[in-house]
């Protein structure tokens, strides 16, 4: 069973994690679902992998488990876990003390196999067993300095621009620079000492998972610039065809009005009538029709005021409405394709240059026998996708039965894709796994974290019978006034933000559904309860509003 804990701040997450780990160390669940103590310790810590986000958190978790295990072994009655463990396993204090003492002894004498680490470190350990598959020597080093390697790759690219076979790249760099300047952005071909180097900033995209998830496909398809040239031509064709069709429809609609001696000002609303939209289309503007325009297509009663309905309304409606309907239809799937063409055309030169930088980074890694830390998750993803879990365990020389992932809201999509098959293998053998996190505390988007995994991604991967969800909403840390303040302000903020998002989706004519109640769902468990021990504690909440729009003023005032 995969246990998913959604643990809000101060809800006892640390206590729960430690308890769950110790439960796995001391006992097991039999075929009837009952928990039993091990008769003797069998180095269970070797078959449990607990991962978290930082080295500090890793050390704290190790210390906490050893410390609590020591209390269970030597001062059992004082352990905060002993009563729960006795009830769970149906055993005595002496039995808990005995197995805890033996387990602690085995753990301390086998400490190097105490598998609590950061996600990155675990991935590196696995990769070292697949050096042949990834094309590196067994002695490869992990390179932490992405900027240095990127700068070296760009320097090499610059030095090769005079080569005959790099003429295409030179032209792309020129086009990219021109595009940046025309769009009002700065452009700098700097060197390592300069803070602003446009290509180095662009190369930062290579470490983002939005690129890594499609990297292999991109590199295989873009082997030369002619592919991208053909793509640009196709995107231009899509844009021109859509804009031409839309303008023709606008002109056709205006022609109908002219034949009947009417103009947009004759419709309900006069100069602000819904059909004034036609003028924008005829002028070549591409923007979705308003909700009012959409509502009046197919509804002739809303076209004119009752006292101003022209005698030709029936024939006008029969001629004009089909044209208007076709215009609205343009802003379905055709508009999505058009927008895709417009947006992708803006970045196609950047993509071509990125591919060249990426290939030179790969050359640097092979020449220096290093692997960028930011590449480990992506490379391991390819390894795991090509092999099943038993083979991976065979390669790394150990088998993990139980997985525990802390701070799961900071896990990235690639990292989860690496863990998911291993957890799936664990669940297929009826083992226990644990995920703990809080979407409201996801603060590492700059490191590709994806809070939606905890919100909905994990649940969609497994059957309902394979996982359980629990919201830990008791706050043991804060007094009543703080908890109540947070409940009210964040609950209302989530509701207002969801409404704002829905309005923007509606106004932009985007397809509805994908963001429906997404924010409200993420904050569905925002409400916390106050622990009895904190009900009488006093506290204070102060809210200060700053009128200045300058960030510097905000920082200075908030730190004062």
Where are these regions (language model features)?
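Conserved helicase NTPase motor core
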Residues: 2-9, 44, 49-53, 57-58, ...
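Alpha-helical scaffold elements adjacent to nucleotide-binding pockets in ATP/GTP-utilizing enzyme cores
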Residues: 16, 20, 60-68, 122-129, ...
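Short, polar/flexible loop-turn hinges at active-site or ligand-entry regions and domain interfaces
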Residues: 31-33, 37-38, 42-43, 71-77, ...
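Core structural elements
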Residues: 111-124, 174-184, 190-210, 352-357, ...
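Accessory nucleic-acid engagement/destabilization modules that flank
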Residues: 121, 134-137, 152, 156-172, ...
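Helicase-core coupling region on the C-terminal RecA-like lobe
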Residues: 186, 193-197, 471-560
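Conserved ATP-driven helicase/translocase motor core recognized via long
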Residues: 191-370, 553, 560
